[in-house]
Amino acid sequence: PVDAQGVVRSGTGSGAVRGPELNTRLVVSLAGCMALCIGFASALETDQYYAWGRPLADSTDAVNARFNLELERAIASFPADRQPENCRKVAVAYRKRMRFLLLHEIQVWAWNSEWVDRIPNGADEQREYRRTNLYSNHPLLDTGTWMPYTPTLEVAGVRFGTDKLAHLVSSGWTYYGEYRKGLKKGETPEDAERRAVNRGITEESLILGKLASGVTSIPDLEANYAGMHFYLDLCDVDDPILKLGAAGWFISRPVDLRDYVTPRWDESYQPPLYTKGRWRKVKPVLETYCDRLADPQVVEMRRRYREMDRGSLVGDMVAERVAEGKIQDPAQFSIEAVCSEPDPSREGAPKIADRIEIVSSQADDATVMEKVVAEDEDRRRFALGLAGLHITYPLVASASIAVMVTTQPST
């Protein structure tokens, strides 16, 4: 059994190409490029060990405010006299507001909002982070590290990379669709959930993780699974978040990330899987964090995580694959496995509490919402053109162009 620390419990011809053959090759090439781009974007790496021992304010209220603000805007996008009869249409509008093809809106917001505390934060910290983080030791042509590293934030008492918010709203929708497909095929809700998680494990083991960066992130899978329940809660449960009243759709209860975040989103608690090549680069850096295991903040946090951890379907299914020999045991990639020192957080742990109370960094939800709205209105949106040229021996050149939509403060 695997515990929570380790988890879980082409052609060679010459000449011109014409007609249908050219079209076929073009379509295949474009599809391949899109898959790789999406894979690289999904392979944004994060390092929670870097934040160990560093103070970080809980940003639950700010993140909740953003999620609820976008839901309000999704509802408002429909004319008052032409409200959709189907709740799922509102959910689709919400999903479109939260995600994008590569870097998702909610993640970019978390990177930049003054109301979200994060590590690293500021140019100097970011430079240090790129130089010393868990994935800093990599070859120049390591495409898996070309995308930006994601900072750590804290929500519901759990530290995780901002990429998990993107997984929640993006891959969570994919899981939701797979779940509904299973139900339509006559599967039980339990089997439909397993169908969705199984697809996610397969994708993360291939283009979205292992092939793109040499990392199979189980915390990403946990965020994906939570995202499925996030979308189910909008319309498909007995007490949905969205309800239809006389004046149209309204939020019956606010979105609360406390319902979805678990300690298994923290990659220092639930380690990913690595390919041999990636592990050779990661392990020496991981060993430099061993002395932080005894840091009082780290000891308290890891004890608290174990109290909060109630297991998960993702953990169960990963453990099944480990037992079948289909994937590696994540325990071998944990900090406990590489450090000679014992983990102090396992010694003399206090009695598990019946309920973990989370004290947020902000007390007045309405005030936080107002601040998030004001910040959003003070930003201007614009597009940047990006161009690149790559030359390799012998005499092979490739070029790329792209447009990045971004924002910056107006004042």
Show the residue positions of the predicted features.
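Generic short amphipathic/hydrophobic targeting helices enriched at N-termini
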Residues: 3-4, 13, 23-24, 34, ...
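Compositionally biased, intrinsically disordered low-complexity segments enriched in Pro/Arg/Gln/His
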Residues: 5, 9, 18-20
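Serine residues within intrinsically disordered or low-complexity segments
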Residues: 10, 14, 29, 398-400, ...
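Extended rod-forming repeat segments used as scaffolds/tethers
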Residues: 10-12, 30, 371, 377-378
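Intrinsically disordered, low-complexity, mixed-charge
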Residues: 42-198, 208-221, 225-386, 393-407
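Active-site glycine-rich loop that binds ribose-phosphate moieties when present
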Residues: 201-204
